[in-house]
């Protein structure tokens, strides 16, 4: 005959089940597990807020830890870490106005090697001729800049006034240039005419004077006579001259 497990009913079955669960619980648990349950690690983090202008941030971390594997009762231990400090090396673009200017300057010099008309020797040449030529070029550029600024000043008065002002300025500039050219031409013409008259007079004198003798005027003749006679008693008056 087959054997069957005994059947339990009522309180007897409940008691047997409770004892069976307690026996299983004792097999799977140990004293170390109970000690680990009592071990507590807590980490407290404290953030210190500084003013916005300060580039330094600091934080302290406190760790309280009890003994885990020791058999003695756990005692609270506090470990204090050194503050973590971080420095902000670079300023934002908004706070550094020279960043954009510096980049544009570097790009200008990097891209200007082929377009530049000045060589290294020419720039470092300190002779008078080179300095004079460079000053002339600078003067020319400054004159152009002054002209453009004058045009902008006139143009800033308004659309209609700007158009009329620019036209009047150009007309006035043209008239001034024409007047200067005309005066220079007249002065040159007068000089040419004066030179032509002197040349004609010299030609006429040379045509009339065919001899090599030198003629003295009346005053020179009187002085010559006095010197030849060597007469100191002979006084001269202003009328003789």
Swiss-Prot record:
Name of the featured protein: Phosphoprotein
Task of the protein: Plays critical roles in regulating RNA replication and transcription through its interactions with multiple proteins. Tethers the RNA-directed RNA polymerase L to the nucleoprotein-RNA complex. Recruits the M2-1 protein, a processivity factor that is required for efficient transcription of viral RNA. Acts as a chaperone for neo-synthesized nucleoprotein by forming an N-P complex that preserves N in a monomeric and RNA-free state and prevents the association of nascent N with host cell RNAs. Recruits the host phosphatase PP1 to inclusion bodies to regulate viral transcription.
Chain intervals for the UniProt region annotation (Disordered): 51-78, 202-241
InterPro entries per UniProt: Pprotein_pneumovir
One CC-aspect GO term: virion component
Residue numbers spanned by region Oligomerization and binding to RNA-directed RNA polymerase L: 120-160
Marked site: Interaction with protein M2-1: 108
Keyword field: Host cytoplasm, Phosphoprotein, Viral RNA replication, Virion
Compartments, record wording: Virion; Host cytoplasm
UniProt-annotated stretches for the region Important for viral particle assembly: 39-57
Subunit architecture: Homotetramer. Interacts with protein M2-1; the interaction between the two tetramers is required for the anti-termination and elongation transcriptional activities of protein M2-1. Interacts with host phosphatase PP1; this interaction recruits PP1 to the inclusion bodies. Formation of a complex PP1/M2-1/P allows P to target host PP1 phosphatase to the M2-1 substrate. Interacts (via C-terminus) with the nucleoprotein N (via N-terminus); the phosphorylated phosphoprotein P binds to N-RNA complex. Interacts (via N-terminus) with the monomeric RNA-free nucleoprotein N.
Compositionally biased region (Polar residues): 55-78, 213-223
PTM (free text): Constitutively phosphorylated by host. Phosphorylation at S-116, S-117, S-119, S-232 and S-237 is required for transcription inhibition by M2-2 and viral particle egress. Phosphorylation at S-232 and S-237 increases the affinity of the binding to the nucleoprotein.
Region (Binding to RNA-directed RNA polymerase L): 216-232
Segments of this protein annotated with the region Binding to the N-RNA complex: 232-241
Region (Binding to protein M2-1): 90-110
Family to which this protein belongs: Belongs to the pneumoviridae phosphoprotein P family.
GO molecular function: RNA-directed RNA polymerase activity
Region Binding to monomeric RNA-free nucleoprotein, annotated ranges: 1-30
Keyword Transferase recorded: no
Stretches with biased composition (Basic and acidic residues): 202-211
Pfam families: Pneumo_phosprot
Predominant location category: virion
Composition bias, Acidic residues: 227-241
UniProt modified residues of type Phosphothreonine: 108
Chain positions covered by the region annotation Binding to host phosphatase PP1: 81-87
């Amino acid at each position: 005959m087959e054997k069957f497990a005994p059947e339990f009913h009522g309180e007897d079955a409940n008691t047997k089940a409770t004892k069976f669960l307690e026996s299983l619980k004792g097999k799977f648990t140990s004293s170390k597990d109970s000690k680990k349950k009592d071990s507590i690690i807590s980490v407290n983090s404290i953030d210190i807020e500084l003013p916005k202008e300060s580039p330094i941030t600091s934080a302290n971390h406190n760790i309280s830890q009890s003994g885990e594997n020791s058999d003695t009762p756990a005692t609270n231990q506090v470990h204090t870490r050194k503050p973590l400090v971080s420095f902000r090396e670079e300023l934002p673009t908004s706070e550094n106005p020279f960043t954009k200017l510096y980049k544009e300057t570097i790009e200008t010099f990097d891209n200007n090697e082929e377009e530049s008309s000045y060589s290294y020797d020419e720039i470092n040449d300190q002779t008078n001729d080179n300095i004079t030529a460079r000053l002339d070029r600078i003067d020319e550029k400054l004159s152009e800049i002054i002209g453009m600024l004058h045009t902008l000043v006139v143009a800033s008065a308004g659309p209609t006034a700007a158009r009329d002002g620019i036209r009047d300025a150009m007309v006035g500039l043209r008239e001034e240039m024409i007047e200067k050219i005309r005066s220079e031409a007249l002065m040159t013409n007068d000089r040419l005419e004066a030179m032509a008259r002197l040349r004609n007079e010299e030609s006429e004198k040379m045509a009339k004077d065919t001899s090599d003798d030198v003629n003295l005027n009346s005053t020179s003749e009187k002085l010559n006579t006095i010197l030849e006679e060597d007469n100191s008693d002979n006084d001269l008056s202003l009328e003789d001259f």
